Amino acid sequence: MGASAFYRTRWTTLDARATAGVTPLAGLAAWGEAVHQHHDGGRNSDYVTLAAGLEPVRGLALTGSARLGSAVPAPSVLTDTAQDLRDYQATLAFNRSRLGLQAGWARTSAFTPFGYAEYLRIPSIGPVAETEWVTVGARIAPVRWITLEGWYSNPREGVPEGLPPTHSQTAVTLRSKFLRQFPSGIFDLKLRLSMEAWGDGVIGRDATGDPVRLNGATFFRSLVQIQLQSFSLYWDRWNLSATDLTYVPGFRIPAYGSSFGVRWEFLN
């Protein structure tokens, strides 16, 4: 159990929270949090979060959570008011060393989001209705040095603005320590190739209030990472297919963009 109270900002003068958790049986846990926030202008955010997890057998887990109440999304905007929260989520997962499977369901309550100030071409996002989401994922490691993994998420009905439908990501990772050459295990090589894709949707609204179309796209990304004891380096490249498509209009993703870095830790 725990409790806290803070003065956050001039717009949130009180942030009080109380938490409690319990593990009555092996493989069963529950947790809860109650939040009260007082905002400038006499506004309040009051909600509770409840979560529980059950592991009936080794590797199999069932988890669920709910968030109920009301919250002010942007306290610094004096005209913003509290919106109802009715969010639910449930996940069934199976994880072992060579295989992992996951299926999830979520329902998010209706809300009116704010646009992002840094995206001038998308000044606003339309109201979002109550939405149900289905997410599935898998991980397969046929041998110790190779891993195939991916996930897929899509709303069951309708397409909310700001989030792409049929969103997925898949990746293959090769990893080896070259134990014959480095029996101490100080060497680690990681090669990763991933693909992210989404379908057609609506990213937001323009200055006139008309929907801004989001075209479906596919992007490829690679990562090379080498570690030798406390010395490591990486080379990350994205948009390997040099596509002109993007996620936010006006923010072009460079073709064959790269970033690299070196890290060396040592003690004197």
Residue ranges and their predicted role:
Residues 230-259:
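Predominantly the C-terminal beta-signal and adjacent terminal strand-loop region
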